[in-house]
Regions:
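Conserved N-terminal beta-strand and adjoining loop/helix that marks the start
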Residues: 5-32
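Short, His- and charge-rich active-site/binding loops that engage polyanionic ligands
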Residues: 37
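A conserved beta-turn-beta hairpin within the catalytic core of GNAT-like acetyltransferases
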Residues: 41-45
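Short, solvent-exposed loop/turn elements at beta->coil junctions and helix N-caps
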Residues: 11, 82-89
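Unchanged
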Residues: 54-77, 87-141, 163-169
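Charged phosphate-binding loop/patch that engages nucleotide di/tri-phosphates or the phosphate backbone
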Residues: 143-169
Length: 169
């Protein structure tokens, strides 16, 4: 199939999405989270995993490796796809988010301007000011076995801008 036969022409009123990755790096029973800088437009002062936009020449797995290395300085292993979100934020463009977990043998992290990195015990993570979807998804992810298939999640927002997460069965 040629590039022109892929059906990527959005003039037919199709909904476009931006691909992103989100990664949770584990070391023992701790999870690496970033407290986003107060000057950030998206999720200032809130805790989230690391990640970002998938570049045009990347696949989701390569992007996850790159984002982890860029934002933490860590080399990781056992990078596993845990969830795929389809996010409808009531705009012309949505987001497809690939959520990964990874293991790190090191706790030596690099500073960056995105925020501050913190190793947080898994059993106390819900006590932090997390990005709004994490209290819903992290318990599922932490309970997964390495061979479990990824979760598929549709995320939307109601008229009061409250999040709704629907997990595929």
């Amino acid at each position: 199939m040629s590039a022109s036969e892929q059906g990527a022409d959005a003039t037919a009123g199709r909904w476009l999405t931006i691909p992103r990755t989100l990664c949770f790096v584990m070391n023992g029973s701790d999870v690496l989270l970033m407290k986003r800088s107060p000057h950030k437009r998206i999720f200032p002062n809130r805790y989230n995993g690391v990640g970002g936009h998938i570049e045009r020449n990347e696949d989701p797995l390569s992007s996850a490796h790159r984002e982890i290395l860029e934002e933490t300085g860590l080399e990781v292993h056992d990078l596993l796809l845990r969830a795929v979100y389809n996010i409808d934020a009531n705009q012309e463009t949505g987001i497809v988010l690939f959520v990964f977990t990874a293991q790190s043998d090191s706790r030596n992290i690099s500073a960056n301007d995105e925020g501050t990195l913190h190793w947080i015990p898994r059993d106390s993570i819900l006590q932090y000011d997390l990005v709004e979807d994490l209290p819903f998804i992290l318990p599922h992810i932490f309970a997964m076995n390495p061979t479990d298939p990824p979760l598929f999640v549709h995320v939307s927002y109601d008229e009061d801008d409250c999040i709704s997460m629907r997990f595929a069965k």
